[in-house]
Amino acid sequence: MSVKIFNSLTKQKEIFKPIESGKVKLYVCGMTVYDYMHIGHGRSWIIFDMVVRYLRMRGYEVTFVRNITDIDDKIIKRAGENKESPAALAERFIQILHEDEKALRVLSPDQEPRATQYVPEIIKLIQKLLDNQYAYTGQNGDVFFDVRRFKDYGKLSHRHLDELQAGARVEVSDSKRDPLDFVLWKKAKPGEPKWDSPWGEGRPGWHIECSAMSSSILGQPFDIHGGGLDLKFPHHENEIAQSEAGEEKPFVKLWMHAGLLEINKEKMSKSLGNIISIREALKESDVEVLRYFLLSGHYRNPLSYSKENLENGRLALERFYLALRGLPVVNHEKTSSYTDRFYEAMDDDFNTPIAFALLFEMVREINRFRDNNQIEKAAVLAAELKCLGNIFGLLQYSPEQFLQGAKKEADVQEIKKLIDQRNEARAKKDWKTADQIRDQLTDLGVAIEDSSDGTSWRQE
């Protein structure tokens, strides 16, 4: 067994050798819980869900930790706007997170630490940084990390200090010695959550939370740290600096970064206002369509969210389920060369595009067996296909369930398309075409109602 993974730290694929043979300790940066999760977050969840499933299938004992940031400036701001406590807001969105996670078929982490549960460990790490002279107390009472004191700063993002811009998710403050210094502990402000510390009442900064939680649970160093590409700098860079300056030993062996989900060639993000929530996405597409789409590109590459790409995902899954339909269910007891080749693709930095191409080879082979009336061979290969599909969280329905749902989804898309065409005809005062399309919709059992708000429809 030889899995190769691209290490962002060394910028090359490496043969993965866990620190402890047969055991993998994995930490992935989780959510700041102040709003609904969007499908860009969903991509990162599903990518690392795939990594965990695959490593476990390959025989590794995986300890998967994903944190929750439940105290943060954004949480405090949103709670104030909503006139609720930060704790109540965070708890509400933690429940929503868990519901979305389940809806996406994402495996729950083995441990899910919350920042507020690890304040003593955070304070202990900050004290070590002060003792080692990597941190200082500013004039305003905040505690800052002294970036220029840490000589390896920039080794993950592969940039020199002089190239790095201040202000990129690093708060600007007159109390800093250097614009790149970042806050470890924030002095309490009136009405904000606070904890006692040697430096006065306050709360943790964002970056120090992950350093303290990951090392407290997994030890230091641990095997793999993952997250979205947008976290590489400054968040992950700062984690390395804090952890290695505080503990005086390496932090993480291997860094994995998931490519971003784009919409109209821009990163999907709340700041750009172009997000699609996980809940909205699941109203439009089945969970398996979403999972297939989000895993269809290599995890390190950007992926474009579009109706066309989602439709391609639906059609791909339809091919899988059509191949499985009508075959007897048999136990998956032995594997063929297909499984070996699947492992070969996935062992090469989780190359899902090649792995999916191989699954389609299996579909073609199943169909050939079926055409030649070799039903037993088709059924055996179908069982193997379902087993491999499980690594991606796919092929969990019966063929009848999925295909009936896909037909309904296709019908809805066709209805919406006809309504759009009718609205275009009405806008051009082409009443003949508009009436013809209305008749088509009536034949499909669809009643439409026009109003000043637009056209609504229902199936009769």
Curated annotation (Swiss-Prot):
* Superkingdom to which the source organism belongs: Bacteria
Name the EC number(s): 6.1.1.16
Q: What keywords tag this UniProt record?
A: Aminoacyl-tRNA synthetase, ATP-binding, Cytoplasm, Ligase, Metal-binding, Nucleotide-binding, Protein biosynthesis, Zinc
Q: Name one GO biological process term.
A: cysteinyl-tRNA aminoacylation
UniProt motif 'HIGH' region: location? 31-41
Which GO CC annotations does the UniProt entry carry? cytoplasm; cytosol
Which cofactors does it use? Zn(2+)
Query: Single GO molecular-function term?
Result: cysteine-tRNA ligase activity
Cofactor notes: Binds 1 zinc ion per subunit.
Write out the annotated subcellular location.
Cytoplasm
Where is it chiefly localized? Answer: cytoplasm
Quote the record's binding site residues for Zn(2+). C29, C210, H235, E239
Where on this chain does ATP bind? K270
Q: Where is this motif: 'KMSKS' region?
A: 267-271
Looking up InterPro entries in the UniProt record yields: Cys-tRNA-ligase, Cys-tRNA-synt_Ia_DALR, Cys-tRNA/MSH_ligase, CysS_C, Rossmann-like_a/b/a_fold, tRNA-synt_1_cat_dom, tRNAsynth_Ia_anticodon-bd
Question: Entry's CDD domains?
Answer: Anticodon_Ia_Cys, CysRS_core
Which reaction is the catalytic activity of this chain?
tRNA(Cys) + L-cysteine + ATP = L-cysteinyl-tRNA(Cys) + AMP + diphosphate
Pfam families associated with the record? CysS_C, DALR_2, tRNA-synt_1e
Subunit structure as annotated in this protein's UniProt entry? Monomer.
| Recorded family membership | Belongs to the class-I aminoacyl-tRNA synthetase family.
Write down the NCBIfam families for this protein, in alphabetical order. cysS
* Name by which UniProt lists this protein: Cysteine--tRNA ligase
Please report the organism this UniProt entry assigns to the protein.
Coxiella burnetii (strain RSA 493 / Nine Mile phase I)
